[in-house]
Amino acid sequence: MLDIDKSTVDFLVTENMVQEVEKVLSHDVPLVHAIVEEMVKRDIDRIYFVACGSPLNAAQTAKHLADRFSDLQVYAISGWEFCDNTPYRLDDRCAVIGVSDYGKTEEVIKALELGRACGALTAAFTKRADSPITSAAEFSIDYQADCIWEIHLLLCYSVVLEMITRLAPNAEIGKIKNDLKQLPNALGHLVRTWEEKGRQLGELASQWPMIYTVAAGPLRPLGYKEGIVTLMEFTWTHGCVIESGEFRHGPLEIVEPGVPFLFLLGNDESRHTTERAINFVKQRTDNVIVIDYAEISQGLHPWLAPFLMFVPMEWLCYYLSIYKDHNPDERRYYGGLVEY
């Protein structure tokens, strides 16, 4: 196990998470609402979120929210996919919202430039006001925070929640917006109470050479963020992500003793689908971890699961890496260390 002061590890964002979420709720969400006000004035009827990595997964979650509770046309597209296969419809009734923490992601900047050239409303969500991405967008929000999963998810959710509220009010959307007020306290509780369990699960998972992550519903994008982005980039663990409903259509054939699985189990309508996969796997291997939103939700809406489930996964992945004697901040290639 790596001997390290966790307060020095940039990967671990639990320390200031609550304060950052409180700040975004009070200061930055109203700025999102102002952008949505302009979108409504311009009769925007199509939204393209463009991002890469974890920011893309946050945007995908917001896209699923829109699909579930509205007829809004919302898309979440990887940067180069947007640039290489630019949507046929890109005009003055579209919005292109680029999400990039450092604001230097080449393809996201290019996507905003493409959108602006076609007359689309453009906005950028990034950490600093002087990020390069801000010059490519008509509007920008610099959130000044490090817990990017929570922040990006909150900003993208706020776009969708406000658009639905203004254009086609929905009772469930009202419940989600109301429960967001309780998010800081709920996150704080998990930060304080989940470290030891996360350590135990991380130690267990560190013994596995790779992990299959399985999720459904609003947790699908978080499943990718944790099972691919986090495991591969930060813990150097091989990973694969499977959508719960697709598990029986091929992937079930690799289940056997010793094969490791991580399940993210929500309490939305897709719960039974993931439970079916869990039951099948548990009959055939003991290497199973289940993170269950029903146990940590604190009564919050099922579509807030991606916010809360992040905390157990943050602790699990941190300790997984530490038990593998790997500092999650260490890189071999990423961030310009090697030409790509």
Swiss-Prot record:
Question: Induction: what does the entry report?
Answer: Induced by fructoselysine and psicoselysine. Makes part of the frl operon with FrlA, FrlC, FrlD and FrlR.
Reactions performed catalytically: N(6)-(6-phospho-D-fructosyl)-L-lysine + H2O = D-glucose 6-phosphate + L-lysine
List the Gene3D superfamilies hit by this protein, alphabetically: Glucose-6-phosphate isomerase like protein, domain 1 (3.40.50.10490)
SIS domain location, by residue? 35-169, 201-331
List the PROSITE patterns.
Answer: SIS
E.C. numbers: 3.5.-.-
Q: Which UniProt keywords apply?
A: Hydrolase, Repeat
One MF annotation (Gene Ontology) recorded for this entry: glutamine-fructose-6-phosphate transaminase (isomerizing) activity
Q: List the disulfide bonds.
A: none
Q: Name one GO biological process term.
A: UDP-N-acetylglucosamine metabolic process
Inhibition and activation profile = Strongly inhibited by ZnCl(2).
Question: Null-mutant phenotype, please?
Answer: Cells lacking this gene are unable to grow on fructoselysine or psicoselysine, where they do grow on glucose.
Q: In which pathway does it act?
A: Carbohydrate metabolism; fructoselysine degradation; D-glucose 6-phosphate and lysine from fructoselysine: step 2/2
Q: Which NCBIfam families match?
A: PRK11382.1
| Role description | Catalyzes the reversible conversion of fructoselysine 6-phosphate to glucose 6-phosphate and lysine. Functions in a fructoselysine degradation pathway that allows E.coli to grow on fructoselysine or psicoselysine.
The subunit structure is: Homododecamer.
- The protein here is known as Fructoselysine 6-phosphate deglycase
Per the UniProt record, the source organism is: Escherichia coli (strain K12)
